[in-house]
Amino acid sequence: YRLSLDENKSLDGSDTTQTVGVGVPVYFYFKLNSVKLVDKSQLANLDEIVKIAKEKDLTIHISGAADSATGTNGVNRHLSKERARYIGKLLIKKGISKERLKAVSLGGISQFSPKEANRFTLVLLTK
């Protein structure tokens, strides 16, 4: 099973650049060049995300990223997609339907300092 996604496109192909969230985004941080979380305790947030999404009938937006300071553009695009897929698959295993997920790959970014802070998957609930 593969969760498909494209840069700035949701699973249904629509543009996701104008997404407005409900509540606060949740970040999952990853090790360098990996889809392994820095700390597995971060996964405790998934149960609450699933509970709220189901109770409030919300869509879950997933954005994967890599730090642009390491790796090539191609490697970072691939890595950011795999990070988003990883979190998406975990949400599906916890009972979220694929139709409720919108996933994007941000590729390599340098938005945050230190550079390790750019190795993430962000989860945002939306109406």
Tell me the role of every PLM-derived stretch.
Residues 36, 40, 65-127:
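Periplasmic OmpA-like peptidoglycan-binding domain that tethers envelope proteins to the cell wall
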Residues 1-59, 117, 121-127:
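Periplasmic peptidoglycan-binding/tethering modules of Gram-negative envelope proteins
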